[in-house]
Amino acid sequence: MSTSPLAGQLLPADLLVDLPKLIDAYYTNKPDVGIAEQRVSFGTSGHRGSSFNTSFNENHVLAISQAICDYRKQAGITGPLYVGIDTHALSEPAQISAVEVLAANGIEIMLAKDGEYTPTPAISHAILTYNRNRTSGLADGIVITPSHNPPDNGGFKYNPPNGGPADSDITNWMQARANELLENNLRDVKRMDYHHAIKSATTHHHDYVHNYVKDLINVVDMEAIRGANVHMGADPLGGAGVNYWSAIADHYQVNLKVLNTAVDKTFSFMTADWDGKIRMDPSSAYTMQGMVERRNLFDVAFACDADHDRHGIVAPSCGLLPPNHYLAVAIEYLFQNRPQWRANTAIGKTVVSSAMIDKVARKIGRRLYEVPVGFKWFAPGLFDGSLGFGGEESAGGQRIKTASFPRFLPQKLKQKPAAILASAISCLPMNLAMQLKPV
């Protein structure tokens, strides 16, 4: 496929999404379940689509929300349901629709305090924190986001009690149930108007930002980062973490500058991806062009997608760091510097990830656990401790505690000089990973 002449460029106003028409289509377009593209379809991470082509509309969200309520009942999940949204234009109306159904079903829901946007890792963190040391009354969550996809997209993800993306057994059940509800014209969907739903005794508000930020110190050596005075830059790309980065900088007094705090639901500040479409994809050289141009302003800089479960790292020496290079370095470092991990703890990778990871695994004597594309395949292993690391080439490296960890690891590497830092930020050949030594 050829690269668009718009790639790497800011789009003219007439090519930006028409927000009023997008929202209107969300409410007025009704899916035809006889058309495959208009049915509920859970991919690698939830249901996604656009209201313009009737693949993400109010009826989809009502049906999925009721399907989640039905699943919780049959699975015996009775704890709170943590709900978060990103900055896509369709996320707010979708949350309204979901709350109307969840409240009508008597679900204890936890919305973000002050209407704050909520990254996927913050929802996962809330679920895991609540469920710690519990065997019953477990919590789960919903993240309303289409991830890095274009501004006219909407998305709806379910996270079970392990905090990660739902596995195929769960999503297949929900998909079938949601489509059954659509086929029956939503007759079995319980719903109350939003005015009453938001004031329901089962609707609560949760401070995701504070709880997430204060717990970072338990997985990241923030004191070492502060002591090294690494000059960091962070661009949330107008996504759900827009107010998290400054909170982290203030709380831990680290040398971190947030490059863009604007929330623009057209994402007009983003340079277009290879095909001329706007995507908040931090692993794309086209969408990260602005960050790369400013690479010499910082020791290391990073950006995230709209729901902050993907990241891209920019170094002065090479610009955008290839995700597989970083994953290999992160694995090398973590398994050499986490003595509390079990000797049989494995490394998770996807089938399309670099062979560099295989070489690192052999060098450090760790078993590889290879899965299809999609972070959901890592969640059970991370939850039970059989995996120490799960990462994929879309830049979604993550550990069980917090997904901010991969973004801060380069700072930890910088604080430890020698070979690991050089590998992480120099973009040298792939076989360099084999020369790494623990520091």
Go through each PLM region and give its residues.
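Hydrophobic or amphipathic alpha-helical targeting/insertion segments
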Residues: 126-158, 165-167
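Short, glycine/charge-rich beta-strand/loop segments that flank catalytic centers
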Residues: 80-88, 115-122, 144
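Short, high-confidence coil segments that cap the C-terminus of an alpha-helix
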Residues: 77-78, 132, 136-138, 296-299, ...
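Short, well-structured alpha-helical segments in soluble
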Residues: 101, 125-136, 288-295
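Flexible hinge/switch segments at interdomain interfaces of large molecular machines
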Residues: 34-44, 189-193, 259-265
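An N-terminal, well-structured beta->alpha segment
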Residues: 2-104, 129, 135, 198, ...
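Short beta-strand segments
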Residues: 84, 141-147, 303-305, 390
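Phosphate-binding chemistry for phosphorylated carbohydrates and sugar-nucleotides
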Residues: 13-16, 21, 25-27, 108-124, ...
